[in-house]
Amino acid sequence: MNDIDREEPCAAAAVPESMAAHVMGYKWARDKVGQSGCAVYRLHSKSGGSDLFLKHGKDAFADDVTDEMVRLRWLAGHISVPSVVSFVRTPNQAWLLTTAIHGKTAYQVLKSDFGARLVVVDALAAFMRRLHAIPVSECSVQQWTTHAGLPERGSIEAGVVDVDDFDKEREGWTAEQVWEAMHRLLPLAPDPVVTHGDFSLDNLLIVEGKVVGCIDVGRAGIADRYQDLAVLWNCLEEFEPSLQERLVAQYGIADPDRRKLQFHLLLDELF
């Protein structure tokens, strides 16, 4: 997928007055990948400068945008993430303007140069190790669940789980069936680290075979390391199953916990 596939040109969106000066003179495009209820725009510089990204959320999604701003500012002291240029919050809306990280997503690289697949997977594993090595004691953000119990049922009870987007293995399932399948896998021994929360191929940027940063960190926080491993494991299945085994080996796990992988694959269906 190239940039044209990911975006469609659009008119400039309305922004708060305090943010207007930051977005003047850019060519706007609406991002079509991974918006998760928010409007995401890429602002292309016309003068050869750096591009920007604008994320806008309303109501509950305004909280998601706010969460991402908080995590970006904290993670900036530990790993490469977009810099916050401007942030505005009102009771019902939030706007987050950030710098764009140079590079192609890991998904784009694998699609365009499958011969680079081993280099890419090794780079992703190395970046995940760096992220997970951040001291948990320095992070105040807890993720959805520990393995003493299941996560909050909020998304199920609110009826916002997209059952049509479930993985092939769970086509036709209800959200309750996913919940029950998760319950059958408990208890699991917790292994908390600082996680990305959505460590997918579209959220990792690569230049010359190395990960240069990550984006969409609104779900980052303390959780089991298998949360990130499971998300990336699932993404790699599209390309070659052997890449999944290489991922966990390069990460440093000789014998992956299949129950934990399955638990987190199920958990991801609910978000």
Swiss-Prot record:
Gene Ontology process terms (BP): response to antibiotic
Cite the active-site annotation.
Answer: 198
Per the similarity annotation, which family is this? Belongs to the aminoglycoside phosphotransferase family.
Question: Its Enzyme Commission number?
Answer: 2.7.1.95
CDD domains given in the database record: APH
Instruction: Provide the reaction this enzyme catalyses.
Output: kanamycin A + ATP = kanamycin 3'-phosphate + ADP + H(+)
- What's the top EC group for this one? transferase
Instruction: Quote any Pfam family the record assigns.
Output: APH
Q: Which UniProt keywords apply?
A: Antibiotic resistance, ATP-binding, Kinase, Nucleotide-binding, Plasmid, Transferase
NCBIfam families, per the entry: APH_3p, APH_3p_I
Name the UniProt record assigns to this protein: Aminoglycoside 3'-phosphotransferase
What are the protein's GO molecular function terms? Answer: ATP binding; kanamycin kinase activity
Which SUPFAM superfamilies does this one have? Protein kinase-like (PK-like)
Function, as annotated, reads: Resistance to kanamycin and structurally-related aminoglycosides, including amikacin.
Q: Which InterPro entries match?
A: AGP_Transferase, Aminoglycoside_PTrfase, Kan/Strep_kinase, Kinase-like_dom_sf
Q: Which gene encodes it?
A: aphA
